[in-house]
Design a protein with these regions (language model features):
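Active-site entrance/lid segments in N-terminal catalytic domains of soluble metabolic enzymes
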Residues: 1-163
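Conserved active-site-proximal phosphate/metal-binding subdomains
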Residues: 18, 148, 157-175, 181-333
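Residue-level detector of alpha-helix initiation sites
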Residues: 26, 180-181
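Generic beta-sheet signal
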Residues: 45, 86, 141, 177, ...
Length: 333
């Protein structure tokens, strides 16, 4: 049987899988369009997306906006499916990136790394300024019920929308994220009430992933003991693969730098041991001696590179196997 669909407003994803937006440069148009072509929601990561632009150091705002528009356009040329953009609230260019994504007609904006309280306001202002009714869906990334409550109150106040879920007959979709690796995991979360799941790690280990092959190889080589939790220079925790770069920072090392990207609001150059943007750009290019790879908790289970098509097909088979598994018989004594 087919996966159940994931419905976000009038968007219908035939495969209830959202590919995680992975920056810097790990998920761009190539990966996103491949996922969308398989019926899922492909997501372009907005963080430092202009890293390859010639003027990124001298004009980071325009370089990033230009690259974002181009990646959305490239994805559109490669698929008729659903394309989203992940934009972190912590970015100094958050509002500009949101506006550009809306104007470029991204289907969905996913936003976390902070509470995206002003997303509806920016959306409405963009519609008014451009005199156009855009259809971009807005999806906050949250980690608690309290955060959901805060966002719901703020968004209702700023949009005037009322909570009419029962009258509309449409449930608000919840997309579960974290540790989703198999079709069985997808079934588990959907049984708990999720409408879909987000997956990141599995999509790194695909031919279509936009990262360098050496970055992907780090995933294949990873063992469970290689996974650690780090606190990034901008104060956010993350799961990463231990390497010499991370070890040197833990030992009190510091890589002096001049801030040229001005990418994250919370970055204080005088207190920051290294430039997170530079480290992640190096990693994306395969230079892991001068950077590191963020990862998911199941990275040690990755053992080969596959196509996006084969990955989603295998997830479908695993999902079907759980559905078709005979119920255990109960034997009375």
């Amino acid at each position: 049987m087919s996966f159940p669909t994931l419905n976000i407003g009038d968007l219908i994803a035939k495969t209830p899988i959202v590919q995680g937006g992975m920056g810097v440069g790990i998920s761009l148009s190539r990966l996103a369009s491949a996922v969308a072509n398989e019926g899922g929601i492909g997501v372009i990561a907005g963080a430092m997306i202009g890293m390859k632009e010639p003027d990124v150091a001298s004009n980071p705002l325009e370089a990033n906006l230009r690259a974002l528009r181009r990646e959305i356009e490239k994805a559109r040329e490669a698929t008729q499916g659903i394309i989203g953009v992940n934009i972190m609230v912590a970015l100094t260019t958050f509002a500009e990136m949101v506006r550009t994504s809306i104007e470029a007609k991204a289907d969905v904006i996913f936003s976390g790394a902070g509470l995206p309280m002003d997303l509806p306001k920016i959306f409405n202002e963009t519609c008014e300024r451009k005199k156009e009714e855009f259809k971009t869906k807005l999806v906050p990334i949250i980690s608690s019920g309290r955060a959901a409550t805060l966002i719901a109150r703020k968004w209702m106040a700023s949009t005037g929308y009322k909570p009419l879920e029962d009258k509309a007959g449409r449930a608000i979709p919840v997309i579960a994220a974290g540790g989703v690796y198999t079709g069985e995991d997808i079934k588990k979360y959907m049984d708990l009430g999720a409408s879909g799941v987000q997956m990141g790690t599995r999509f790194v280990a695909t031919y279509e992933c936009d990262a360098d092959d050496r970055f992907k190889q780090a995933y294949i080589d990873a063992k469970q003991e290689d996974v650690t939790i780090i606190k990034s220079p901008v104060g956010m925790p993350g799961r990463a693969l231990v390497n010499n770069f991370i070890d040197s920072m833990r030992d009190g090392g510091k890589k002096p730098f001049k801030c040229i990207f001005h990418c994250v609001k919370t970055c204080e150059q005088e207190k920051t041991p290294y430039c997170i943007a530079a480290a992640l750009i190096n990693a994306m290019k395969g230079n892991l001696e001068r950077g590191f790879a963020f990862c998911g908790e199941n990275v040690s289970r990755v053992n080969n590179i596959v196509s996006v098509h084969d990955l989603i097909s295998s997830l479908q088979r695993e999902f079907d196997a759980i559905i078709n598994k005979p119920a255990a018989a109960t034997v009375k004594a």
